[in-house]
Amino acid sequence: MGSFSIWHWLIVLLVVVMIFGTKKLRNMGSDLGGAVKGFKDGMKDGSTTDAPAASSAPAAQVTGQPANSDKSTIDVEARQKS
């Protein structure tokens, strides 16, 4: 009673194909595959380019003056818990 049989899954698959159509499902599958491939490439590129840059680049100095005097931004100062 707790699990679905093969007939339940076939009926669900048939309803999904009838609602979306095979062309739309194929497009969604290729879009999902492209997104996963792009994510993996980005993770691979990000890990190889960030490692040397982080070790050789000097740390930026934080000053009390805001770099941008835009009125729509909020200046927030971090404080330690006491």
Swiss-Prot record:
The annotated regions of Low complexity compositional bias extend over 51-60
**What residue spans carry the Polar residues bias annotation?**
62-71
Pfam families from the entry?
A: TatA_B_E
Q: Where is this region: Disordered?
A: 39-82
Sorted keywords for this record are: Cell inner membrane, Cell membrane, Membrane, Protein transport, Translocation, Transmembrane, Transmembrane helix, Transport
Give a Gene Ontology cellular component term annotated to this protein.
Answer: TAT protein transport complex
Residues annotated as transmembrane: 1-21
Q: Could you tell me where the Basic and acidic residues compositional bias lies?
A: 72-82
Domain of life, per UniProt, equals: Bacteria
Q: Give the GO biological process terms.
A: protein transport by the Tat complex
Please provide, alphabetically and separated by semicolons, the GO molecular function terms listed in this UniProt record. protein transmembrane transporter activity
What range does the record give for the signal peptide? none
InterPro entries per the record? TatA/B/E (IPR003369), TatA/E (IPR006312)
From the Swiss-Prot or TrEMBL record, state where the protein is found.
Cell inner membrane
Annotated membrane topology is: Single-pass membrane protein
HAMAP family noted in UniProt: TatA_E
Q: Which family is this sequence assigned to?
A: Belongs to the TatA/E family.
Describe the subunit structure.
Answer: The Tat system comprises two distinct complexes: a TatABC complex, containing multiple copies of TatA, TatB and TatC subunits, and a separate TatA complex, containing only TatA subunits. Substrates initially bind to the TatABC complex, which probably triggers association of the separate TatA complex to form the active translocon.
Function text? Part of the twin-arginine translocation (Tat) system that transports large folded proteins containing a characteristic twin-arginine motif in their signal peptide across membranes. TatA could form the protein-conducting channel of the Tat system.
Quote the protein name from its UniProt record.
Sec-independent protein translocase protein TatA
Q: Which organism is it from?
A: Variovorax paradoxus (strain S110)
